[in-house]
Design a protein with these regions (language model features):
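Conserved CoA-thioester-binding segment of acyl-CoA-metabolizing enzymes
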Residues: 1, 18
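Short, small-residue-biased leader/transition segments that mark boundaries at the very start
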Residues: 2-10
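Anionic-ligand binding patches
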Residues: 15-17, 24-202
Length: 202
C-alpha cells in the first residue's frame, strides 16, 4: 500500500481526520489550512482517547492513532498547552484539565501567579500525522512565547487566549483570527505539517 491510497488522493485533494472533539480547534485548523487542497473532518463516533502520555508529542500520537483506528484514514492530532516558567512548566500537558471550566482555568492560573514578576510563558503545540493503520508519518512542534497578563482581555479565541500577551500588550484574544494564526503555536505546527503533506503525500 502506498502512502496515499486512491481513495485519499482525488484531483490533488486529500481528506484527513483531525482528531479532536473541540469544534474551536477544527475551525482554527481549517482557517490556517486555507486553500482547500486538504479537507479536515472530525473523527468518527466513539472517539475518546485516553491521553495518558507524559509529553505533548506522546498525547498527540495517542489521539492520532485512535482516530485512525476508527476511520482507517490518515489522521492528524495536536496536543497543546500552556507552559508557565514560574510554575515550572505548569499547567503543561494538563492545561485542558487544570480546572473544570475555561473561566476556572484562567482564574486558577492568575491566582497561582498572583504578584509574581516573572510571567514568561509559552504555548506549545505538538502535531502528529499517522496513516490509516496508525503508523507514524510525521511529527512536529510549534511554540509561541509570550507573557501572562494580570487580567484577562479580549473576546476572540478560546482557552487561555484572554490572558496570553503576545505583542504590543495585546492578548491573543484581542487579535483577529488572521493575526493569531500567523503567530500561534498551532499555526506554526500546522503550516509545517501541510508543507510536508503537499511535498510528500500529494
Amino acid at each position: 500500500r502506498g502512502l496515499v491510497g486512491s481513495e485519499m488522493c482525488i484531483r490533488d485533494s486529500m481528506k484527513i481526520v483531525f482528531a479532536t472533539g473541540n469544534p474551536h480547534k477544527l475551525k482554527e485548523i481549517q482557517e490556517i489550512a486555507g486553500d482547500g487542497d486538504i479537507e479536515f473532518v472530525l473523527p468518527a463516533k466513539g472517539f475518546n482517547p485516553v491521553e495518558d502520555g507524559e509529553t505533548f508529542e506522546e498525547n498527540s500520537l495517542i489521539k492520532a492513532r485512535e482516530a485512525a483506528k476508527l476511520s482507517g484514514n490518515y489522521s492528524l492530532a495536536d496536543d497543546s498547552g500552556l507552559c508557565v516558567d514560574a510554575l515550572n512548566g505548569a499547567p503543561g500537558i494538563h492545561s485542558a484539565r487544570y480546572a473544570d471550566t475555561a473561566q476556572a482555568r484562567i482564574d486558577k492560573l492568575l491566582n497561582a501567579l498572583d504578584d509574581c514578576e516573572n510571567r514568561s510563558a509559552k504555548f506549545v503545540c505538538a502535531m502528529t500525522l499517522v496513516d490509516g493503520e496508525g503508523n507514524l508519518i510525521y511529527q512536529t512542534r510549534g511554540e509561541c512565547r509570550g507573557e501572562i497578563s494580570r487580567k484577562q482581555s479580549g473576546t476572540n479565541g478560546f482557552g487561555y487566549d484572554p490572558v496570553f500577551l503576545v505583542e504590543k500588550n495585546r492578548t491573543m484574544a484581542e487579535m483577529s483570527e488572521d493575526e493569531k494564526n500567523l503567530v500561534s503555536h498551532r499555526g506554526k505546527a500546522l503550516r509545517d505539517v501541510i508543507k510536508f503533506i503537499k511535498s510528500e503525500l500529494m
